[in-house]
Structures are given as structure tokens and as C-alpha cells.
Amino acid sequence: MPKILVLYYSTYGHVESMAYAVAEGARAAGAEADVKRVPELVPEEAAKKNHFKIDQKAPIAEPKDLLEYDGIIVGAPTRFGRLPSQMANFWDRTGGIWAQGALIGKVGAVFTSTATQHGGQETTLYSLMSSLLHHGLVISGLPYSFQGQGRLDEVTGGAPYGATTIAASDGSRQPSKNELDGAKFLGKHVAELAKKLTAQ
């Protein structure tokens, strides 16, 4: 049974919801899936003032946790078309793991949230992938066998580079069923790939 880590950062809860959907998909494929988050860097007083979702139940991840998993699926909201500092800080602490080549050959994938359809989803996914590629992970996208990618009857996230959701400028829009289905599909797909690779 492959072990999958869903590692995320979420400011207002949108990526958190997607993370649990990703984990659900991985478990549906027979994998063991853990959801963990990276540490918040914003002082608690400022986070509360800006209405951050601070009551997230997922445990805080440490870089050494990465070694325990066959697949690592990373999610974070956009910050001007790139990954946020909280997620960058986590990967900046993995130099020793990189030097050992300890993550080479594991399966990786990414997911994100933006305020609008054109708010930097694909560039954020690419920036999340960058650390995974430097660590030698085998990257999986969200294939078009997920039929929800081609929908034109609603405003929806989803890209071949990873699962996405649209939150609206004020954060009022929660992930839709189609977006959560895309997240589940991504988790299932990564789990199936990890199962094949670990069977070698």
C-alpha cells in the first residue's frame, strides 16, 4: 500500500478543503494518505485581524516527514502568480534532503486556489512543481480523463498541470463539486502511479 502525503498551506480554507478531497481520492485508490500543513509565518494577531482560518486541524509538517512517503501532493494558494512564502519557506528547509537525493523517484503533484479564473493558476502550479522537480520527483498532472476539465457550463477550476479552485476576490466562493471531484481524481491518480512505482 503506497503512502501519500498531502502537504498544503491555506489562508482562508479553500486549499484546506481541496487537500482533504485529494486525500480522499488517494484513499479510494487503496493508499494510506496523511494531510499535513506547513507552518504559518504571519504573526497570529495579524492573521486574526485579516480573517485567516487559524483553526485548521491538520498537523504541522517537518521536512523529514517527506522521507516517509511514496507520493507527495502539494497545494497552496497563489501569491501574485506564484507560491506563497509559507510554502517556499518549507521547501527552503529541505536542502539536506535534496543533497541526499532522498526524494528521487517519488510521485509528485500540485493543486492551487486563485481569486479569479485568470489569477495565476497555471504559473502558481508551475512554481509549486519547481521544488518537486529539483528533488527528482516524477510529476503527475491532472489528465483529461478527468471529464470535469472540459466543462463549459459553469465557472470552474482545473488544469492539466493540477487541480484548482476559484475563491473569488473576497474569498466567498468555496470549492465546487466539480473542483473537489478534480482534487479527488488527482489524489487517486497519484496513488495509482505510486502503487505501480513501488511495485517495481
UniProtKB/Swiss-Prot annotation:
Query: What Pfam families would the database entry show?
Result: FMN_red
Q: Which cofactor does it need?
A: FMN
Tell me the superkingdom of the source: Bacteria
Catalysed reaction(s) here are: a quinone + NADH + H(+) = a quinol + NAD(+); a quinone + NADPH + H(+) = a quinol + NADP(+)
Q: Kindly state which keywords UniProt assigns to this record, in alphabetical order.
A: Flavoprotein, FMN, NAD, NADP, Nucleotide-binding, Oxidoreductase
Enumerate the residues binding NAD(+): Y12
The UniProt record lists the Flavodoxin-like domain at 4-190
Q: Where does substrate bind?
A: W98
* InterPro entries linked to this entry: Flavodoxin/NO_synth (IPR008254), Flavoprotein-like_sf (IPR029039), Flavoprotein_WrbA-like (IPR010089), FMN_Rdtase-like_dom (IPR005025), NQO (IPR037513)
Q: Which residues bind FMN?
A: 10-15, 78-80, 113-119, 134
Q: Could you tell me the EC number(s) of this protein?
A: 1.6.5.2
Q: Which Gene3D superfamilies would you find in this protein's record?
A: 3.40.50.360
CC annotations in GO: membrane
Molecular function in Gene Ontology: flavin adenine dinucleotide binding; FMN binding; NAD binding; NADH:ubiquinone reductase (non-electrogenic) activity; NADP binding; NADPH dehydrogenase (quinone) activity
Q: How is the cofactor bound?
A: Binds 1 FMN per monomer.
What is stated as this protein's family in its record?
Answer: Belongs to the WrbA family.
Listed name of the protein: NAD(P)H dehydrogenase (quinone)
Could you read off the lineage of the organism from its UniProt record? Bacteria, Pseudomonadati, Pseudomonadota, Alphaproteobacteria, Sphingomonadales
